[in-house]
Amino acid sequence: MVSLCVGVCRRAALSSKVPKFGIFLNSHSATVAEQFAHAGYDWLLVDCQHGPMDSITLSGMLCAISSGGAKSMVRVSGYDDRSGIQQALDLGADGILVPYINTAEEAEAAVSCCLYPTAGTRSVYFPQRSMNKAGLLGYAGVQNDNVIIALQVETADCIKNMDSIAQVKGIDMLFLGQVRRH
């Protein structure tokens, strides 16, 4: 039986001041994802922003990560990628990394896509793999507290608006994307 406090435990782990180690997966291979998940990483991030990723491949990779006990994150295309956010969460991702956030309004839009009403605008579809963790009521009833929402800091506008972005309710972490910062 899966505990319904998984999100609380995840959030407590995030704020525990103990470093969490993970990697970006660009191989698009469930076998590689499974090997890394069993290697002791705390989290693995599947990159759907770059490269050819379809839902079948993503589904297999998320299952593989789950089998090894690591937390799964999926990087989507942006705050306006509602279908990518929805699909990743429906397939069982533990969290979402949203790139190209420049304003608090964009951050709010990203958070809204990740959360069920009344906190957000995520739609419900069942049966889905993510609900296997606790059943429909157990899942939908606590998922707003469970999902990890990370925003990628990578633009000058984001840095300029960092204070207001960081105040958006529902954000668990800001991730520094050093390559594109300008």
Where are these predicted regions, by residue range?
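Expand to "…catalyze enediolate/carbanion chemistry for C-C bond making/breaking, isomerization
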Residues: 1-182
